[in-house]
């Protein structure tokens, strides 16, 4: 198991997640249903044990019931639950959550990318109810498996199953995805969090823009609050969104809160309002795509 995959943000925020209170905003109800393309859920419960490698698990629970309250307060109707890395490949809590609260949630699972059985595991998890798989190749040598022989079978299996490949990786790794995308022309590929491109390295974003030549690549508009060096509404990070919007169009951008990771920096309400209210270069139709219709393309919400 590649321990370098365990991104520091996904482990470090457990204690921070209560740092910023969330409040219900004032907003106009849109004519479309708002879809959050990524959250995580977890619970401290012996029925769902933490992975052995998770040395400092979050002490505060972050459950679907808690999320539903935020969704209702902010006018969000559907959400994608991505498997929390603290459970590694044990996807049961995410699966039980999407089943319990159907049809509100859809789920994205994790499989071990260095396990030759990963494609078959993905098939099984898809049959059980997941729609998508997430991988996280690290920037260092520990993430070099992205260029290894086990990746094409996993990507091709996702393509044959008709489920998206979700990739959370730093901007320096983005060029490594091109050969896999080219091998799977009918696979939807979702790049998480704008690849966390630093705002002080705008030329690095060219690597992400280069993937716009592939028509099934989608970009999550998220993590503005962590890459930004400014207060809300994070205008320096908005410049990344502006450039991605010019390259991909709104039809291939989709919003995600990344709750509860966001709570270490901001609120769920602001993670949404920055797109809905404060990106002045977006018109109403653009927002309907980024906040709703693009996600509908990737995840078949009922």
Language model region names:
Residues 132, 145-254:
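Catalytic pocket-lining loop regions of alpha/beta-barrel enzymes
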Residues 224-226, 259-262:
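Short Gly/Pro-enriched loop/turn and capping motifs at secondary-structure junctions
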Residues 21-153, 157-161, 199-202, 235:
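Mid-domain alpha/beta scaffold segments of enzyme catalytic cores
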Residues 94, 177-180, 275:
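Hydrophobic packing residues within well-ordered alpha-helices of enzyme cores
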Residues 71, 98-102, 181-182, 212, ...:
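N-terminal cationic-hydrophobic initiation segments that often serve targeting/anchoring roles
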Residues 2-37, 46, 57-78, 242-243, ...:
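Mid-to-C-terminal alpha-helical segments outside catalytic/metal-binding sites
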Residues 39, 84, 194, 258-259:
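Active-site metal-binding loops of divalent metal-dependent hydrolases
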Residues 81-83, 110, 220-223, 254-256, ...:
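Short beta-strand segments
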């Amino acid at each position: 198991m590649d321990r370098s995959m365990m991104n520091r943000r996904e482990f470090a925020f457990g204690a921070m997640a209560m740092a910023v209170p969330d409040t219900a905003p004032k907003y106009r109800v849109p004519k479309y249903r708002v879809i959050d393309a990524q959250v995580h859920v977890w619970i401290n419960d012996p029925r769902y044990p933490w992975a052995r490698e998770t040395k400092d698990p979050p002490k505060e629970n972050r459950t679907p019931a808690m999320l539903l309250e935020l969704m209702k307060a902010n006018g969000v109707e559907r959400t994608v639950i991505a498997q929390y890395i603290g459970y590694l490949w044990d996807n049961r809590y995410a699966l039980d959550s999407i089943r319990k609260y159907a049809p509100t949630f859809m789920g994205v699972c994790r499989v071990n990318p260095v396990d030759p059985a990963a494609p078959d595991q993905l098939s099984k998890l898809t049959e059980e109810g997941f729609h998508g798989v997430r991988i996280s190749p690290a920037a260092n040598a520990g993430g070099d498996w992205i260029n290894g022989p086990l990746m094409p079978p996993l990507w091709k299996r996702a393509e044959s199953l008709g489920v998206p490949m979700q990739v959370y990786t730093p901007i320096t790794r983005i060029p490594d995805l091109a050969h896999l995308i080219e091998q799977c022309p009918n696979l939807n590929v979702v790049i998480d969090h704008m690849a966390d491109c630093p705002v002080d390295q705008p030329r690095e974003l060219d690597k992400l823009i280069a993937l716009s030549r592939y028509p099934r690549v989608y970009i999550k508009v998220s993590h503005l609050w962590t890459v930004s060096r400014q207060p809300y509404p994070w205008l320096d990070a908005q410049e990344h969104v502006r450039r991605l919007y010019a390259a991909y169009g709104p039809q291939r951008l989709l919003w995600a809160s990344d709750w509860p990771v966001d709570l270490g920096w901001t609120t769920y309400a602001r993670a949404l309002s920055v797109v809905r209210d404060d990106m002045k270069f977006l018109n109403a139709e653009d927002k309907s795509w980024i906040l709703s219709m693009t996600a509908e393309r990737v995840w078949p919400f009922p």
